[in-house]
Amino acid sequence: MKISANSIRTGNILVYNNDLWVVSKTPEHTQPGKGGAYVQVEMKNLKTGTKRNERFSSANYLEKAELEQKDYQFLYFEGDDLVLMDTKHFDQINISKEMLEEKLSFLTENMIVKVEFYNDKPLNIELPPTVILEISETDPVIKGATATASYKSAILENGIKVKVPQYLEIGEKIVVKTDDMTYVERAK
């Protein structure tokens, strides 16, 4: 599917120079005093992992990869792979842990994830937007602390450090965003 250079967004997967590239940073739209407007795009090659900056004229159209998305359930780790099961057909696949990088610690047993395929090859794993985790370490509650803008550090059950409101204690469950690893609210 062709998209305008102005429509490129972070996370888009583009077919460029016969390779697949993922847009890794928010594209910068620039309109210089002389010459035509352009879009500066930082992207990463999905095969080699190399990063590249490209300028595309605002009038350009690029090929956006047509991805098929399927729901999979995470079962367990097997060496350096994740073992996932298709929730519809119950087929199992192995995918490298590297595909999740720093978000690997959010993965819990039986979690439903979205796997994106291009030509029947897994390209990307999308975690749910938020997860519920328990606080395993934090400073004690300060008497009289309210839901103000002051935060303290907390370490969650998966080892991730987040800033949480002063009134939260060890053992409480909180909702955390998986994309930027930030506190959302106390779990209900």
Curated annotation (Swiss-Prot):
Which terms does the record give in the GO molecular function aspect? translation elongation factor activity
Q: What GO biological process terms does the UniProt entry carry, in alphabetical order?
A: peptide biosynthetic process
Chief subcellular site?
A: cytoplasm
Q: In which pathway does it act?
A: Protein biosynthesis; polypeptide chain elongation
Subcellular location, record wording: Cytoplasm
Q: Which InterPro entries match?
A: Elong-fact-P_C (IPR015365), NA-bd_OB-fold (IPR012340), Rib_uL2_dom2 (IPR014722), Transl_elong_fac_P/YeiP (IPR020599), Transl_elong_KOW-like (IPR013185), Transl_elong_P/YeiP_cen (IPR001059), Transl_elong_P/YeiP_CS (IPR013852), Transl_elongation_fac_P (IPR011768)
Keyword Cytoplasm (UniProt): yes
Q: Which CDD domains match?
A: S1_EF-P_repeat_1
Keywords of this entry: Cytoplasm, Elongation factor, Protein biosynthesis
What are the cysteine partners in each disulfide bond? none
Per the record, what is one GO cellular component? cytoplasm
HAMAP family in the record, alphabetically?
EF_P (MF_00141)
Q: What does this protein do?
A: Involved in peptide bond synthesis. Stimulates efficient translation and peptide-bond synthesis on native or reconstituted 70S ribosomes in vitro. Probably functions indirectly by altering the affinity of the ribosome for aminoacyl-tRNA, thus increasing their reactivity as acceptors for peptidyl transferase.
Q: Which family does it belong to?
A: Belongs to the elongation factor P family.
Q: Which NCBIfam families match?
A: efp, PRK00529.1
Name of protein: Elongation factor P
Organism annotation: Rickettsia conorii (strain ATCC VR-613 / Malish 7)
